[in-house]
């Protein structure tokens, strides 16, 4: 569970590109010798645009679950035992509130990062006009030219003693060196080679067209116009340990608790809507041969390529 860029280790902006970022740059017109992988991140795909979920979507609800449980801890751990032991006492109540209120404020702030916000923060890649649209946390939209974005691998938090990585897109100033804004593509892992599969999926769509990756999309998130179903969210959370059945089984109680937080976060958040001018730029033909969305999903999420 890595919340880099959202909670901890915010993406630094208004700075120059580092040597490491330059050496890890992902070249847009270079075809990598690796198979593209959609990472179960697609919402829609067609001849005009590819829309994906945000980097943190796979973890959505985990922090909410921790906070919801955490909000009740002082009551059950301190207040109720105190009342049972000494009865109602104003001084004890003041001490309890003095300690608990700052803690509740912290839990509420963390909870607001996942709940009472947006169900997701979509990223849309338009291969026709070569533009990228990123839905920000405040409801505004970042619009940038695909050719002007500097994509690179970025260091995240360490996971179980190993360095975790993600793919970042830096929007640069006119000098070509100063970072004005950063967004991340869906997916993070300690295995850099896996990220290159995910990058190749996005890169081929934008550089080679929808036909190059159409058959690589097996399942789409049904969240464009409605909130995610509880069962879909629960199954999707298991994908964070895809290919590790023992880990999935052993952590199934954790996933279940987190799924309740995910359900709460989704039900208290709004569905993002693109501005009318962006929808006009991304118009899709009714008989698009490369149309993929949730209406064509199989019954279950394929966790491995078919």
Residue ranges and their predicted role:
Residues 161-224:
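A membrane-cytosol interface segment of integral membrane proteins
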Residues 37-54:
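Residue-level recognition of beta-strand termini and adjacent short loop/turns
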Residues 131-132, 139-159:
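Phosphoinositide-dependent membrane-docking surfaces
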Residues 53-120, 233-306:
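Alpha-helical transmembrane spans
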Residues 1-42:
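Short, non-transmembrane cytosolic segments of multipass membrane proteins
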Residues 118-140:
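N-terminal topogenic membrane-targeting module
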Residues 138-142, 148, 205, 209, ...:
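Cytosolic/matrix-facing juxtamembrane and C-terminal tails of multi-pass cellular membrane proteins
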Residues 118-119, 149-173:
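Juxtamembrane cytosolic face of transmembrane helices
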